[in-house]
């Protein structure tokens, strides 16, 4: 789940992954507050299962046989303590907010403060109630507080806006994958 603040000059430093980033590993313990890019190891894992990557697109094996395991040698371990690595996702108290996360949080807060009197859309895609205080409730509060704010929620089975902001909201009870982009492998 992402909070994304877009402007015309989009770039990666304008994205704040407040709930984490599937593209990063962290120590599962965690023994330290650092994350690691996992793109190369994930590609190796995917290829080891028989998939192919052509023109940046993931393709099923030609024979249709997908291996459901990866070689032991591809399992990542923490370079400091040796424990298994895990995805950098906010699921419990082990979530690592590294330096990059804190820098992104500051950029996000600055963006909100600089634009709160302008037209702003809070777009919520597939956010549930696992940790509503991180994305959902702040979006509702800012929509209610900021005069020109608008809230858009796309979430199958959980598309909802409180009464206080319903006139400034659009809620769509649809699956994000089918509504926003084409389905992938």
Describe the function of each predicted region.
Residues 1-185:
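Conserved catalytic alpha/beta core of Sir2/sirtuin-type deacylases, generalized to analogous enzyme cores
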């Amino acid at each position: 789940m992402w909070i994304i603040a877009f402007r015309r000059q989009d770039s990666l430093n304008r994205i704040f992954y407040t709930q984490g980033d599937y593209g990063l590993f962290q120590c599962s313990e965690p023994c330290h507050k650092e994350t690691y890019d996992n793109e190369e190891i994930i590609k190796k894992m995917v290829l080891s299962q028989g998939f192919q990557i052509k023109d940046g697109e993931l393709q099923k094996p030609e024979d249709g046989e997908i291996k459901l395991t990866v070689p032991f040698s591809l399992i990542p371990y923490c370079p400091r303590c040796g424990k298994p690595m895990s995805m950098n996702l906010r699921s419990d108290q082990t979530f690592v907010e590294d330096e990059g996360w804190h820098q992104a949080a500051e950029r996000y807060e600055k963006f909100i403060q600089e634009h709160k009197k302008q037209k702003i859309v809070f777009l919520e895609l597939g956010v549930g109630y696992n940790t509503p205080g991180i994305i959902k409730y702040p979006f509702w509060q800012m929509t209610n507080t900021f005069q020109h704010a608008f809230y858009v929620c796309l979430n199958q089975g959980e598309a909802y806006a409180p009464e206080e902001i319903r006139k400034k909201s659009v809620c769509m009870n649809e699956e994000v994958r089918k509504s926003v982009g084409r389905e992938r492998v």
